[in-house]
Amino acid sequence: LPEGPRLNVVHVAVDAHNLARDDRGIGRYARAVLTRALRDERFRWTFVVRDLFPKRAAVAHALGTDAVEVARRVPRDAGVMWFPWNGMFLRTDVPSVATVHDAAPFAFPSGDARKRAIEQNPFLATANTARRILVQSRFTADEVEHRLGVDPERIVVTPLAVDSIFTPAQSGAPDVLPVELRGRRYVLHVGAHDERKNTGTLIAAFARAFPAGDVALAFTRRPPSLPAGGVVIDAPDDAALAALYRGAALVALPSTYEGFGFPLLEAMACGAPVLAARAGALPEVGGDAAAWVDDAHDVEAWAAALRALLADDAARGVLAARGPARAAEFSWERCTAQTLAVLEEVAAL
């Protein structure tokens, strides 16, 4: 019998130094794309790890499969190497693609010269050597072009998505909230508390908006100073996080700088009304499915918006209805297909 057409297999090396342990949005992104990419028979994958970083078992566990090839050095026969971790962290002669999630080390440079160099060097290496740079928003594309001096022809926008667990409430067993929040109205903040997250503005605005303490302010990570009425639900898993979104009277995202904004998309997917700062990539992701504060640092504007939305069930209902439809416009399958197309293109250059 005649043989069928043979697949032209592209050998991709992946910088996997952080694959098993990164619990941030970057790790979620890398695992979401790679678990889907591994199903494509046109590609062969080698995961490059280093001393003291995850070995084969850890990478296999992170990707949910034993069919992984792991190496300590970039294979000589790799056609392309992908760096998912916000820049390039090792040198290689293999043609490379790097993902840049934001340009925060340049927008908010450290005052310490050594720390600044450590934070910025992977971005500079990317700007100097990567054949293509993947970003998740037009905002980040503009940041990479203007802050790093990259030709826009080298930049490809591949919007992210959210996992299927982030959905509106379904019929069946009701969500079980942490005991501290049961029977209470609460505003939810999801994420870290570094400078650009602007949590201090939210805390100050919340205190002005709800001085009687009849509304709780819930955090998924402990802020530097826990305000009156503050509740910490530390590091919830995805199922617990989805329940927190669904139970929230409002999700508040005051960040002044986001390359994409996972919490915004997750909240919308769960049908939670969202109030966010009109900053960074957040408006690009949220569109008309979120309410916006124009000046991210304006405490009075935040307080007024919090009060108004908590008092207006109809307005929050409109946002809750728009959110899932907006979130459905984002797809991991499309993000993966776009990523693979770029890797294939660079391997063929």
Predicted regions and their residues:
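Carbohydrate transferase catalytic cores enriched for Leloir-type hexosyltransferases
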Residues: 1-349
